[in-house]
Amino acid sequence: QLLMYTSVNQEKLEDGTVRDIQTQAVAVGDGKDYEKYDKNPVLTAKDLPKGASKVDFRDPKIWKGNDGNFYCVIGSRPADGSGQILLYRSKNGFEWEFVSILAKNQNRYGKMWECPDFFELDGKYVLLTSPQDMLPEGLEFHNGNGTLCIIGELDPETHTLKEQFCQGVDYGIDYYAMQTLLAPDGRRIMIAWMQNWDTIAHRCSDSKW
């Protein structure tokens, strides 16, 4: 099994501040024990599109495509301060190349887009992400750090998602960072956080669940 994750190193920037720089790494294991790849990280600032932040570059979701290649989507913050989702491709899971900016926020839905997931379902392509600092829009997006489901078509030439429909996934204040798994019987199963960091103080620390 191949595991992909965000690795963090501290770096002194040009303005003198020390920041956590985010890169992507992989490990190989059997589902229980994993060994880090000795050439980590596999994706760094040099693999980012122009203007993308190396401080906000996290949460890879990896899958194997029908063409035999590995793909992953990663949350990113562009120069405008909002969110975007980057698409990468690899033949072997260890050497990766940038493919496209799959989707751009353009300051419509919150700021940084985290924890992306991307898959095909019933003939449409679905992008899930968890935007930070969302503002209400009608009856939608009242939970601040929330959830977003974008449904549309994937342009095979530009590898960009053509948005057709967009809505929140859950209306509670604690649902965040949802991810899906494809079950052997074809079901797409979603899991997510049960506790948002903004509301942690409202829960008893000695709860039995």
Language model regions located:
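Beta-rich carbohydrate-recognition and catalytic domains
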Residues: 1-59, 64-109, 120-171, 191-209
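Eukaryote-biased detector of low-complexity, proline/serine/threonine-rich segments
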Residues: 187-189
